Amino acid sequence: MNDVFLKALPVLQKLTTAGFEAYFVGGSVRDYLLNRTISDVDIATSAFPEEVKEIFQTSYDTGIAHGTVTVRENNEFYEVTTFRTEGTYEDFRRPSEVTFIRSLEEDLKRRDFTMNAIAMDEHFALQDPFSGQLAIQNKEIKAVGKASERFHEDALRMMRAVRFLSQLDFELDKETEKALESQIELLQHTSVERITVEWLKMMKGKAAKRAIELLLKVKMETYLPGLKDEKSALSEFASWDWEKRTTEESIWLGLVVAVKPNNVNAFLKAWKLPNKTIQLVNKAYQDALKMKETWLKDELYHAGKAVFSLVNELNVIRGKENNQHKVSQAYEALPIHSKKDLAITGADLLKWSGESAGPWVKETLDKVECGVLSNEINNEKIQIKRWLGYHEE
């Protein structure tokens, strides 16, 4: 049995010893059945939150309104959630009310897909009222109950369906795909932040190309930031070899290269990306458009290692030669990598000249930077001083 389950087993045992039901549920059970890596576990129980808190010496009310208590066991923290049913969904994401219950099956009934609605007890026996194991065996993503109801409850489940297709290389069952297509407009009610998370997970999957093809088939792109009417661009984007991707930034660079938005900055901001990512992708965009494989010395210098590495990564994804080693060698051979590497500063110029500060200081440093970069002058203080015409003291 997987070590992650064995380590968490005392949590289940304490709950069952106290007279309650307790199970591992959700993605960890699914991934165990698929022989995938398991990083953490979710635990569901018939014990109500206050009852859970009485059983464990250390607990935290991390999501008690929805039945979740975090407990500490053997110096590890585990989320324990009470079986529950949910009322109507008012915003296509959150239920209007949550009712704690004692029935495992009723709890599993509210979950998104049958493969995620399997529970495993302390003896590692499975409870599978919705035939999730069969769906896994058939490599099928099938909604629990009516797919239309599950998507209406939380519209993000539609993106999760496409993401799971990519990650697991599964297919959607006919009813689930039909509901996905008929209710796709509900995705507009989902926050961009949640969409971005699912998009990245989808792109990191082994079947990203098929996932994008399904996404286009159901017109999901209409409700993704900046991708409305970009079907042909996304088809091109999907055709590249994304299994060669090593960074998240290459996904965003690839997307802007395919879509060619008028304002790259605004396009990336619409996805709510970190400023650091936006700046890097924006800087790399023009070079990536040219599919630059050879770099002049000043181009390498002004681009910087992060940019040329990212451009090279996208080139490889797009089927070009991997020039990372060659370009890295050329970059490392540069006499300087930024103006900060110069052997002189503005203070030196003021001292040597005896003049007051002004625009001339920056202009002179720029001149020295160009001189050093072109090997016209060595990056040594005394040589630079002579080169600028200042006499030895």
From Swiss-Prot:
GO BP annotation list: RNA repair; tRNA 3'-terminal CCA addition
Gene3D superfamilies from the UniProt entry: 1.10.110.30, 1.10.246.80, 1.20.58.560, Beta Polymerase, domain 2
Alphabetically ordered keywords of this record: ATP-binding, Magnesium, Metal-binding, Nucleotide-binding, Nucleotidyltransferase, RNA repair, RNA-binding, Transferase, tRNA processing
A Pfam family matched in the record: PolyA_pol_RNAbd
Keyword S-adenosyl-L-methionine: no
EC supergroup of this enzyme: transferase
Residues involved in ATP binding: G27, R30, R111, D154, R157, R160, R163
E.C. number(s) listed in UniProt: 2.7.7.72
Residues that hold Mg(2+) according to the record: D40, D42
Reaction catalysed by this enzyme: a tRNA precursor + 2 CTP + ATP = a tRNA with a 3' CCA end + 3 diphosphate; a tRNA with a 3' CCA end + 2 CTP + ATP = a tRNA with a 3' CCACCA end + 3 diphosphate
CDD domains in UniProt: NT_ClassII-CCAase
Residues given in the record as CTP binding sites: G27, R30, R111, D154, R157, R160, R163
Needed co-factor(s): Mg(2+)
Any GO MF annotation of the entry: tRNA binding
Family under the similarity heading: Belongs to the tRNA nucleotidyltransferase/poly(A) polymerase family. Bacterial CCA-adding enzyme type 3 subfamily.
Subunit structure: Homodimer.
Function of the molecule: Catalyzes the addition and repair of the essential 3'-terminal CCA sequence in tRNAs without using a nucleic acid template. Adds these three nucleotides in the order of C, C, and A to the tRNA nucleotide-73, using CTP and ATP as substrates and producing inorganic pyrophosphate. tRNA 3'-terminal CCA addition is required both for tRNA processing and repair. Also involved in tRNA surveillance by mediating tandem CCA addition to generate a CCACCA at the 3' terminus of unstable tRNAs. While stable tRNAs receive only 3'-terminal CCA, unstable tRNAs are marked with CCACCA and rapidly degraded.
Extra remark: A single active site specifically recognizes both ATP and CTP and is responsible for their addition.
PANTHER family: CCA TRNA NUCLEOTIDYLTRANSFERASE 1, MITOCHONDRIAL (PTHR46173:SF1)
Matching NCBIfam families: PRK13299.1
Protein name: CCA-adding enzyme
Gene name, Swiss-Prot/TrEMBL: cca
